[in-house]
Regions:
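Short coil/turn motif common to extracellular beta-sandwich-like domains
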Residues: 1-6, 103-111, 144, 156
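Short beta-strand segments within Ig-like beta-sandwich modules, predominantly Fibronectin type-III
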Residues: 51-58, 102-104, 136-143
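Ligand-binding face of N-terminal immunoglobulin V-set domains in extracellular IgSF glycoproteins
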Residues: 6, 47-95
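Short strand-edge motifs at loop-to-beta-strand transitions and within beta-strands
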Residues: 5-7, 60-62, 143-149
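Conserved Ig-like domain signature around the intradomain disulfide
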Residues: 5-7, 70-79, 108, 121, ...
Length: 176
């Protein structure tokens, strides 16, 4: 999320037409088209964040700027050339790194929160095995994972929470 993504498309000489057909999971479909005989591009229902990376007659790659969760979905590039029709199909999955927060609750137990990640993060504790992770799903497809380490009267001088996620791992330590 937040980065730019370029989806490549088959490069051919003698291209007659190139079409990107985009079907996101959220919102309606959009298309980007190019006709060589008129040297004309056209767009239907596409946001400004999606456009040709370069000139479509030279390189038909699609660039998505500031990728968001709404961009997740199917992307198909169709190239019509003198030597045939060519298709490139992608499914764009958007990863959202969670926000890591570590604090002590009212009972002196460390609580680790991996907020609004996509997919849900895995929360683990260094030198701690008695914890209960809870997941809360959000409307935008992200998930918050909350894990409370129960010490049962043991004084945890320094506890480390590790958050494992496809967008990157994080860790924080705290003394409660």
């Amino acid at each position: 999320v937040g980065n730019s993504q370029v989806l490549t498309c088959t490069r051919k000489s003698n291209v007659a037409m190139v079409t990107w057909k985009i079907n996101p999971k959220v919102g309606g479909p959009c298309t980007l088209g190019y006709r060589a005989d008129q040297n004309k591009t056209d767009r239907t229902n596409c946001s400004d964040s999606m456009n040709w990376k370069f000139r479509p007659d030279r390189d038909p790659a699609l660039e998505i700027r500031q990728v968001g969760i709404a961009h997740e979905g199917n992307y198909t590039c169709e190239v019509v050339a003198t030597d045939g029709n060519f298709h490139d199909v992608y499914y764009l999955t958007v990863l959202v790194p969670p926000r890591l927060t570590l604090y002590c609750d009212d009972h002196g137990n460390p609580v680790c929160e991996a907020a609004a990640g996509k997919p849900a993060a895995q929360v683990l504790w260094v030198l701690g095995s008695n914890f209960t992770p809870e997941e809360e799903g959000h409307d935008n497809g992200t998930v918050t994972v909350l894990s409370r380490l129960t010490a049962y009267g043991t004084n945890l001088t320094n506890t480390t929470c590790i958050v494992s996620h496809p967008a990157g791992n994080q860790s924080k330590s705290i003394a409660c």
